[in-house]
Design a protein with these regions (language model features):
Chain A
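Helix-to-loop junction immediately C-terminal to a conserved catalytic motif
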Residues: 63
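Non-catalytic connector elements of ABC transporters
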Residues: 27, 250, 261-384
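Conserved structural motif at the start of ABC-family nucleotide-binding domains
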Residues: 17, 32-34
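Conserved ABC transporter NBD signature motif
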Residues: 71-79
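Conserved beta1/A-loop at the N-terminus of ABC ATPase nucleotide-binding domains
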Residues: 17-27, 73, 331-332
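The feature captures the beta-strand-to-loop junction immediately N-terminal to the Walker
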Residues: 48-50
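ABC ATPase nucleotide-binding domains
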Residues: 89-91, 95, 99-242
Length: 384, 569
């Protein structure tokens, strides 16, 4: 298990954007630290990281708003050093939009065309088309200050798209919107970028947003790239405890691997992975924490997917002390729409999270026994 | 910070010039480049003339005579002048703030009929020549003045006359500088503070006051500078007992022809002003706060409740007593003829009968407007460039530049005017016979106003808006044109108004350099006042009234010009 600091997905001479050991320092501290990254034409790459991980600075360096202290930014194969922002041909959608308050919607969207000297008529047409595309037909004459957050977002997007940038960058594109709107917009954005063939580099701290939007996800930590891969890759195989925890996985413990058995605070856990013996980090996805048996007297739903494990039936018949698995008290339950997240306090080891279906969820305070599904475990590098 | 990074792989093929490969890139050179114009302007039209006249005083025969400095400084009389200059300026500033801040609040936050008129009215005194103000106050509180007639009350030759006249003068500085920003602060900020548990005053103190502080400090500094260098008011109202440095410099230069002493005093005033600017820079500390400015039209509302109406009434009353009364007396005097009231003095202005002028005094109106217009253009250009540079740059160089631009405000106009005469008379800078000389001198006084008005607003423009423009393809110049300019258009109009007004009223320097056949209004008024006789006095009052009306008309017109899209500002 090695940390994949893949410089880029192979040799891509046609990469639209290419960062080579890009470094930006603020006050001597590297905010972006030797980052290598390539974005192919038509690809959507999402940089994911907690606030302060340097992702916004990365965008600013590409846009030419922050000067690199080392490394190179190449756009379409050309080094951008010394090229001012307005000649880079990249679009940037700011986190808080930064619409021009003194201009109306049409003047905002048409700004990039106007400064390029596009004629009034053509400009009007393209603005109308863009507004149509972002779902704001006929909003040309409206004041941007009178728009709702979602509408401002759409105007900002249309404005960034208008000059036809070779690379569109989005800084927390949906950060300030409420959830329903965000989920709808993310789908719209993705299909829009597909349709237009836009090359997109987005940064966000929201994994849901990143996974929904991106062809490829880049997880950043303290200015460095921690992991790169497709959303499915990153989600199913986080390469470090940091990435795992950042993705919301909390069932991570240090363990010692012998063969396919990891010895950890929760006891011996079977893993599906093959790895050299020795110290490792162990992640168990919440879905892999299987509930066996609530206390007698509680309804034990035999139909529940989580209890329908081989051995589950046997467990119920045996005495409690003799039961295999880890005994846990249900500390709390969080409803997540179609499933429930259980917060468990095990008899040994740190707290656990488990998911189960709504109907199968045991009550708070109930005592359950859990087992770990080897297929839902991930081995991580040992934690320092 | 390294210029070039140790990049593995092939070096960039066509690298740009090394100069652009620095950390901050070309932006680093923007501020210095913008500063070039203003610096040259100030070097030629301020530094050079002032240096020339000071050198003439200290090096009369090509030899430095620095011993004189000690003599002057040891002089008990000079020390008294220095002390009086300082404390009356402090007292005037405090009194002006005390009386004008309620006015600034009322004009910023309340909507009431005649508001625009009120704003113009309080600005009129500021642009009146000091001699006229002196005369107006004499007519009010001097011997045979209105108060003397009514209650036998005389305040001339007391320090109160000086302080009141200074408040009269500078009321507008506070109202315009502080109130202008105040009216664009979002009232909801204060409302938010109220909801968080702050009292009305507490909310103001914690939310509004900090936002206003830079403007407040700027206003206080301006008032202090003006009153520190006060000339006409002190000379006319103070009598022989009171003299500021400026009055003393004038006396030494024009009356005693003691250029060495005048030179020492000029340097002394310089040092004092520089110290003030230093203190100012230290206290304000140039925090670049990106204020959320909103449209001024959206922040005012009719006064609510007895307290607010009382406040409005109090402000109106104080403006009536402080501003309208002296102006009213001025008008009354202009209409008073030996046998009652009439327009005889005004009619006389259109003729050359009195023999004081080679042209009818009324022509001075045209001269003044033309010269002030040119001076305004110069001031806007120089001041606008300087403000743009100050917005972009930081650091010692820029702060020094900022202070330098304020110096003309603190420099004796007499020194500048006389310096123009003796310095700009040899080729290639032989401007003595050029009509440009007067506008140039007046622009010098206008530039600091332009900068002071523009700077807070320019600084409040969010830099990310410029960055957004840049990523959309706008060059820095274009971004300035598209982003900054529309946002500061209102401030620009305001700055133009200020520059125009101070140019119209400028006297101390203009009197030295205006051509006899092209007098400006203040010069013509002073010439009339200098002549004995009721008729000349009446005509001076009449011409002052004309100047006042011209100023009022200009200011009212400026009040009407609002940016087309101000609703979105």
């Amino acid at each position: 298990m090695t940390k994949t600091t893949v410089p880029s997905s192979g040799p891509v001479p046609g990469a639209m954007l290419r960062l080579e050991a890009l470094t930006v320092r603020y006050g001597g501290r590297p905010v972006v630290d030797a980052v290598d990254l390539a974005v192919d034409a038509g690809e959507t790459v999402c940089v994911l990281g907690p606030s302060g991980s340097g992702k916004s600075t990365l965008l600013r360096a590409v846009a030419g708003l922050a000067a690199p202290d080392g490394g190179r930014v190449l756009l379409g194969g050309r080094d951008q050093e010394g090229i001012p922002p307005h000649r880079r041909g990249v679009g940037l959608m700011f986190q808080d939009h930064q619409l021009f308050p003194q201009h109306d919607v049409a003047a905002n969207v048409g700004f990039g065309l106007r400064v390029r000297g596009t004629g009034r008529e053509e400009r009007g047409e393209r603005v109308a088309r863009l507004l149509d595309m972002v779902g704001l037909v006929g909003a040309e004459r409206r004041a941007v200050t009178a728009l709702s957050g979602g509408e401002q977002q759409r105007v900002a997007l249309a404005r960034a798209l208008a000059p036809g940038p070779r690379l569109l960058m989005l800084d927390e594109p949906l950060g300030q919107l409420d959830r329903g709107l965000r989920e709808r917009l993310v789908v719209e954005l993705r299909s829009l970028f597909r349709r237009l063939g836009t090359t997109v580099l987005a940064v966000t701290h929201d994994q849901g947003e990143a996974f929904a939007l991106a062809d490829r996800v880049v997880v950043m930590r303290d200015g460095r790239v921690e992991q790169t891969g497709s959303p499915v890759d990153v989600w199913s195989r986080p390469v470090s405890e940091f990435v795992a925890r950042f993705l919301g996985f909390s069932n991570v413990v240090p363990a010692t691997l012998t063969g396919t058995t990891a010895q950890c605070a929760w006891g011996a856990v079977e893993v599906a992975e093959d790895a050299p013996d020795g110290p490792v980090g162990l992640l168990v996805r919440p879905g892999g924490v299987r509930l066996s048996e609530p206390l007698a007297g509680h309804d034990a739903p035999a139909s529940g997917e989580h209890t329908a494990q081989p051995g589950g039936a046997a467990d119920t018949t045996a005495g409690r002390d003799a039961l295999p698995g880890l005994g846990c008290v249900v500390k709390g339950r969080t409803f997540r729409g179609d499933h429930v997240v259980l917060h468990l306090d095990p008899e040994r080891g740190p707290d656990l999270e488990a998911t189960c279906s709504l109907r199968a969820a045991p009550a708070e305070g109930a005592v359950v026994r859990v087992r770990f599904d080897p297929e839902e475990t991930v081995l991580l590098p040992p934690t320092g | 910070m390294t210029d070039t990074a140790p990049v593995p792989g092939p070096p960039p093929p066509t690298g740009p010039a090394p100069a652009t490969r620095t950390r901050t890139g070309p932006r680093r050179f923007v501020a210095p480049a913008l500063m070039v114009g203003p610096v040259v302007f100030f070097a030629v039209f301020f530094g050079y003339p002032v240096t020339a006249i000071v050198a003439r005083g200290l090096r009369p025969d090509g030899e430095w005579e620095l011993g004189h400095v000690g003599e002057v400084l040891a002089d008990e009389g000079i020390r008294q002048v220095l002390w009086f200059t300082t404390w009356q300026a402090a007292a005037s500033t405090a009194l002006t703030l005390l009386l004008a801040l309620p006015g600034a609040y009322v004009l910023a936050r309340f909507r009431f009929p005649g508001k625009r008129l009120l704003r113009a009215v309080v600005t009129v005194p500021f642009v009146l020549p000091t001699v006229v103000v002196g005369a107006a106050f004499l007519g009010l509180i001097g011997r045979g003045g209105l108060l003397d007639d009514l209650w036998g009350l005389r305040l001339d030759t007391t320090v109160w006359a000086i302080l009141l006249a200074h408040v009269f003068f500078n009321y507008a500085v506070v109202v315009r500088t502080v109130g202008g920003l105040w009216s664009q602060l979002d009232p909801r900020q204060e409302e938010a503070a109220r909801l968080l548990g702050a009292g009305a005053f507490g909310a103001w103190r914690r939310v509004t006051l900090p936002a206003l502080l830079p403007a407040l400090a700027a206003a206080a500094l301006m008032v202090f500078l003006f009153t520190f260098t006060s000339f006409g008011v002190v000379q006319i109202l103070g009598g022989p007992g009171y003299a500021t440095l400026e009055v003393e410099i004038y006396r030494q230069t024009a009356q005693l022809l003691d250029l060495p002493t005048a030179a020492v005093l000029t340097l002394l005033q310089f040092a004092a002003v520089a110290a003030m600017l230093g203190v100012h820079g230290w206290t304000v500390h140039r925090r670049e706060s990106a204020l959320r400015l909103v449209d001024a039209a959206a922040t005012d509302r009719p006064p609510r409740g007895a307290g607010e109406r009382l406040l409005l009434g109090g402000v109106l009353l104080s403006v009536a007593a402080l501003v309208l009364l002296p102006l009213g007396v001025l008008i009354e005097r202009s209409l008073r003829v030996p046998d009652g009231y009439g327009f005889a003095h005004y009619r006389a202005l259109a003729t050359t009968d009195t023999g004081t002028f080679v042209v009818p005094p009324l022509e001075a109106v045209g001269n003044s407007l033309r010269i002030a217009a040119v001076a305004t253009l110069i001031a806007l250009l120089v001041g606008g460039l300087a403000a743009a540079a100050l917005t972009r740059g930081a650091g010692r160089l820029v702060r020094g530049f900022d202070a330098m631009l304020m110096l003309p405000l603190g420099t004796s106009a007499v020194t500048v005017g006389f310096g123009f005469l003796i310095a700009l008379d040899t080729p290639p800078l032989d401007l003595r016979s050029s009509w440009l000389l007067v506008p140039l001198a007046q622009a010098l006084v206008g530039v600091p106003f332009v900068i002071r008005v523009m700077l807070p607003v320019l600084r409040a423009v969010d830099d990310r808006l410029r960055q957004a423009a840049a990523t959309l393809g706008a060059s820095p110049l274009r971004a300035w044109w598209e982003v900054d300019l529309p946002l500061v258009r209102r401030a620009l109009v305001l700055a133009a108004g200020f520059a125009f007004a101070v140019s119209l009223g400028e006297f101390g320097a203009t009197v030295f350099i205006a051509r006899p056949d092209e007098p400006t209004l203040p010069v013509a008024i002073a010439r009339l006042l200098g002549r004995a006789g009721e008729a000349n006095y009446g005509q001076a009052m009449a011409l002052s009234t004309v100047l006042m009306l011209v100023c009022a008309a200009t200011l009212l017109a400026l009040e009407r010009i609002r940016p087309a899209r101000s609703g979105e500002f």
